[in-house]
Amino acid sequence: MFDLDHFKQINDTQGHARGDTVLVEFAAFLRSPLGAAENVVRMGGDEFMVVLITPDTGRLAVLEQWYLQHAAQSPTPFSLGATHHTPGESVGDTLQRADSRLYRERARVRRHPRPAS
């Protein structure tokens, strides 16, 4: 799960048209490393999710590293909470875990910003 950092500030200072452009550009950034069976979903507001159809924790780790290594190419800073769906687990539980990881990462980045690339 991804959350754009300070997105409200973009809308408030640069206007909603610019905010809409940032959302489209960010979705394109998220799609960059994905294969044909992998999708980007906008969850609402400034939250996005990358959905991997085939559960592969190795692929999840590769994508997480790609996004962190290419963060400077994103149109805006973001926070990332990665997790995978466990068989037998509800989708709601998976989303809640991703959301918890996302907000822990967001708090960490605000305390200790990532170095510029």
Roles of regions detected by a PLM:
Residues H6, H16, H70, H84-H85, ...:
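Histidine (H) residue identity feature
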Residues D5-R31, V41-G45, M49-V50, A61, ...:
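Conserved long alpha-helical elements within nucleotide-processing catalytic cores of c-di-GMP signaling
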Residues E25-G88:
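GGDEF/GGEEF active-site signature
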Residues A61-E64, L80-S117:
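Catalytic-core segments of nucleotide cyclases and related cyclic-nucleotide turnover enzymes
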